[in-house]
């Protein structure tokens, strides 16, 4: 392998050009992701199903495409949300939806405090409608999964997006990379070598 790399190592200009090409590929992918985030209004427009809680609708490893431009999430809609303080997206179905303030005074106060924190002092912080979710394959609803003192999810504060499409099993690659961090290093190394070996 080193014999094949020798011509590139002896020619710094060509090596630099290949490295810049590799950086261009990575930056293009990053910009594409950001553009998709802006278009869908979602911080994570594509997510992977990590558990079997939504079977048979979705299996572990399915790749989901999200849309977050709708002001409401209706009963029966499948949404992805983040629990406060945790960075793990959960994919579950809406089983109850409430208009603004209909979710109970305790939940309403929490939502107003969260809205104030995120919007800053002196800015308006309207509270959107609330919802209760549940996995299709789960017996109980998600109340136990929510943050302490939280009774319902808030559409604006907690929801990453609503599922609009999916590709089965494709997400297993990312699950494998997450469960085996060394595979990321190997994959990046292989990509780097392939770029270096490309002929101009």
Curated annotation (Swiss-Prot):
Residues 1-15 are cytoplasmic. Its EC number is 3.4.21.89. Glycans are attached at residue 41. It is an enzyme of class 3 (hydrolase). Residues 103-119 have a biased composition (Basic and acidic residues). Residues 186-197 are annotated as: C-terminal short (CTS) helix. The active site is at 53 (charge relay system), 92 (charge relay system), 142 (charge relay system). The C-terminal short (CTS) helix is essential for catalytic activity. It may be accommodated as a transmembrane helix in the thinned membrane environment of the complex, similarly to the signal peptide in the complex substrates. Component of the signal peptidase complex (SPC) composed of a catalytic subunit SEC11 and three accessory subunits SPC1, SPC2 and SPC3. The complex induces a local thinning of the ER membrane which is used to measure the length of the signal peptide (SP) h-region of protein substrates. This ensures the selectivity of the complex towards h-regions shorter than 18-20 amino acids. SPC associates with the translocon complex. Catalytic component of the signal peptidase complex (SPC) which catalyzes the cleavage of N-terminal signal sequences from nascent proteins as they are translocated into the lumen of the endoplasmic reticulum. Specifically cleaves N-terminal signal peptides that contain a hydrophobic alpha-helix (h-region) shorter than 18-20 amino acids. This is Signal peptidase complex catalytic subunit SEC11. It comes from Arthroderma benhamiae (strain ATCC MYA-4681 / CBS 112371). The gene is SEC11.
């Amino acid at each position: 392998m080193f014999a094949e790399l020798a011509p590139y190592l002896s020619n710094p200009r060509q090596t630099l050009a290949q490295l810049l090409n590799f950086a261009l590929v990575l930056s293009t992918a990053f910009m594409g992701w950001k553009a998709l985030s802006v278009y869908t209004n979602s911080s994570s427009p594509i997510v992977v199903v990590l558990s079997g809680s939504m079977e048979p609708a979705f299996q572990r490893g399915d790749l989901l495409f999200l849309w977050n431009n709708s002001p409401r999430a209706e009963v029966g809609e499948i949404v992805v949300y983040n629990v406060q303080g945790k960075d793990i997206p959960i994919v579950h179905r809406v089983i109850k939806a409430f208009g603004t303030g209909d979710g109970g005074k305790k939940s309403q106060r929490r939502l107003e405090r969260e809205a104030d924190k995120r919007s800053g002092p002196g800015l308006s912080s309207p509270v959107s409608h609330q919802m209760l979710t549940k996995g299709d394959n789960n017996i109980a609803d998600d109340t136990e999964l929510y943050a302490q003192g939280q009774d319902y999810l808030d559409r604006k504060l907690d929801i990453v997006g609503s599922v609009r499409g999916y590709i089965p099993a494709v997400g297993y690659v990312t699950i494998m990379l997450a469960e085996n961090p060394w595979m990321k290093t190997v994959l990046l190394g292989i990509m780097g070598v392939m770029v270096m070996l490309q002929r101009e």
